[in-house]
Amino acid sequence: MRANLFVTAAFLVTLGPCELPSSPGDTDRLTFEILEGYWVDQPPSPQIVLRLATANEYSCMNYWIESELTVADRTLRVDMTGRITIGEICLTAMGPAQYKTALPITEGSYALVFARGGLTDRYTLTVTEAAFEITTVEAHFTRPAADRFPRGG
């Protein structure tokens, strides 16, 4: 009986709850990519999507980087609070905290701006028929996963 109690207690301790990260510093290193496909909601046609991810892995796959996209002319601005949030349930799989949003863009050049806690990162995003190309202007806390992302993949 005592052994069963010990095994049960050890199992519960190992499982652990889905908890929020202990500090806002968990979003210090963010990687982003531009993708084309059915990434957010699946409308009739593919979308161009910005996906940000933390370097840290979390015990639930539905942690989110608290952020908001604003679009003005040819500027795409993502304002981040630095907080990581989670819904009411834990989707039990390991993964980074993420932010995904559809971008209302077509071919051409855009300013891509990330702002968080007084820091601003700036990139130029060039959309062509074949690819999404990223040029770094100024970077403090973000970095592209690549300088070029092929379309449709």
Model-derived features: positions:
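Contiguous beta-strand segments within globular domains
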Residues: 40-62
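An anionic, turn-rich surface loop/hairpin at beta-sheet edges
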Residues: 80-105
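Compositionally biased low-complexity segments at domain edges in trafficked proteins
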Residues: 137-153
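A short tyrosine-centered beta-strand micro-motif
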Residues: 106-117
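Short acidic/polar inter-strand loop motif in beta-rich domains
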Residues: 84-89, 116-124
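Sec-dependent bacterial lipoprotein signal peptides
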Residues: 1-16
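Contiguous segments within soluble domain cores/interaction surfaces
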Residues: 54-88
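Bacterial Sec-dependent N-terminal signal peptides
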Residues: 13-33
